[in-house]
Amino acid sequence: MTAREALRAGLMAALRPALTPLGVSLFDAVPVRASVPQAVLGEPGDSDWGAAGIEGRELRVALTLTDEGEQPRRLRLCVQAAEAIGLAGVLADGWRVAGLSMTGTRMAKTGARWTASVEWRARLWRVGQ
């Protein structure tokens, strides 16, 4: 399993219990048909982050949240819930989390819909693979 796949699986596992109580449907790809509120975890971009004998990757990934309404009250709660998640220390296939930090959030209204994004940087490593 790649670092990208391990990170996506770990984030999905952490986000689901944070967002489900708020009525948000979580997807790992843009759904063809889905009602709001919804959240879509994007594809991570990655780069090398390792040392001698250690395989490491630095990944950046964004969660896009969509809702409707006059004001983004529920969307703000969703962003707060996403900001508060943490990852398990060990992910799939031996990938270990060296760090997870939120790098930014954004919110905007287009027509009747509000869209927010939460972006993270993760550093993962493993030995002997």
Identify the function of each model-found stretch:
Residues 1-29, 43-129:
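Charged, amphipathic alpha-helical segments and their flanking helix caps
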Residues 34-36, 112:
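Short acidic/glycine-enriched loop/turn segments that link adjacent beta-strands
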